[in-house]
């Protein structure tokens, strides 16, 4: 069985819905909006500048594919991609990760309010909720594995 970490935390395989050789995506413990997921390199590196070219490319190609699927699945009409790269940028987990958040018109009064929400402390959801979402997302990537994004 594969062991996956997000920073210092062991991630249950049931929370992961997408993997490549170099990246993985997981559902978010404390989502800002429905469909808020994270994509990370498998290698734990603290900053974007620490990624290899291959990891950087794979991470963003994965983000592109994941965003397309979650936007459609959660009936969004836009995506917010967010990276907090370094402590002074708001990074709280020293493992590069991209927040992928499906958006809808008027989901916030001010569009940029989402960045404040990412920074706020939020209530964690249950592992059962996370596993349910992950199990809904996982087959969508099988269905779309040959689709060009």
UniProtKB/Swiss-Prot annotation:
Annotated HIT domain residues: 1-115
Active-site residues annotated for this sequence: 97
Job description of the protein: Cleaves P(1)-P(3)-bis(5'-adenosyl) triphosphate (Ap3A) to yield AMP and ADP. Can also hydrolyze P(1)-P(4)-bis(5'-adenosyl) tetraphosphate (Ap4A), but has extremely low activity with ATP. Modulates transcriptional activation by CTNNB1 and thereby contributes to regulate the expression of genes essential for cell proliferation and survival. Plays a role in the induction of apoptosis via p53/TP53, SRC and AKT1 signaling pathways. Induction of apoptosis depends on the ability of FHIT to bind P(1)-P(3)-bis(5'-adenosyl) triphosphate or related compounds, but does not require its catalytic activity.
Entry's EC annotation: 3.6.1.29
Cofactor note as given: Divalent metal cations. Mg(2+) or Mn(2+).
Subunit structure: Homodimer.
GO cellular component: cytoplasm
Record-linked InterPro entries: Bis(5'-adenosyl)-TPase_reg (IPR051884), FHIT (IPR039383), Histidine_triad_CS (IPR019808), Histidine_triad_HIT (IPR001310), HIT-like (IPR011146), HIT-like_sf (IPR036265)
Entry keyword S-adenosyl-L-methionine: no
Cofactor requirements of the protein: Mg(2+); Mn(2+)
Gene3D superfamilies: HIT-like
Keywords on record: Apoptosis, Cytoplasm, Hydrolase, Nucleotide-binding, Transcription, Transcription regulation
Record PROSITE patterns: HIT_1, HIT_2
Histidine triad motif, short sequence motif: residues: 95-99
Database matches in CDD domains: FHIT
Enzymatic class: hydrolase
Organism placement in taxonomy: Eukaryota, Amoebozoa, Evosea, Eumycetozoa, Dictyostelia
Organism from which the protein derives: Dictyostelium discoideum
PANTHER family the record matches: BIS(5'-ADENOSYL)-TRIPHOSPHATASE (PTHR46243:SF1)
GO molecular function (one): bis(5'-adenosyl)-triphosphatase activity
Region (Disordered): 120-149
Listed SUPFAM superfamilies: HIT-like
Residues reported in the UniProt entry to bind substrate: 28, 84, 90-93, 99
Name of the protein this chain belongs to: Bis(5'-adenosyl)-triphosphatase
Catalytic activity of the protein: P(1),P(3)-bis(5'-adenosyl) triphosphate + H2O = AMP + ADP + 2 H(+)
Pfam family, one: HIT
